[in-house]
Amino acid sequence: MARFFRRRKFCRFTAEDVKEIDFKDLNTLKAYISETGKIVPSRITGTKARYQRQLATAIKRARFLALLPYTDSHGR
């Protein structure tokens, strides 16, 4: 009977001592968006609630300013 050991998730923003998430930092934001364009939940990424709220706001601002797409490219 095999038991799987699940690795402890940690908050990347806490480890790097980030004060505020910037909507212009697209490389960071892209890491928290699925390939369909949805925001990945914190239970998957391990992000703390404070940073998850900042992340969602930053992604929504970047989408509004056309820095990030709302959805995927639909395979054209």
Curated annotation (Swiss-Prot):
It comes from the Bacteria. The keyword Phosphoprotein does not apply. GO terms for molecular function: small ribosomal subunit rRNA binding; structural constituent of ribosome. GO terms for biological process: translation. Keywords: Ribonucleoprotein, Ribosomal protein, RNA-binding, rRNA-binding. One of its GO terms (cellular component) is cytosolic small ribosomal subunit. PROSITE patterns: RIBOSOMAL_S18 (PS00057). The keyword Ribosomal protein applies. Belongs to the bacterial ribosomal protein bS18 family. Part of the 30S ribosomal subunit. Forms a tight heterodimer with protein bS6. Binds as a heterodimer with protein bS6 to the central domain of the 16S rRNA, where it helps stabilize the platform of the 30S subunit. This is Small ribosomal subunit protein bS18.
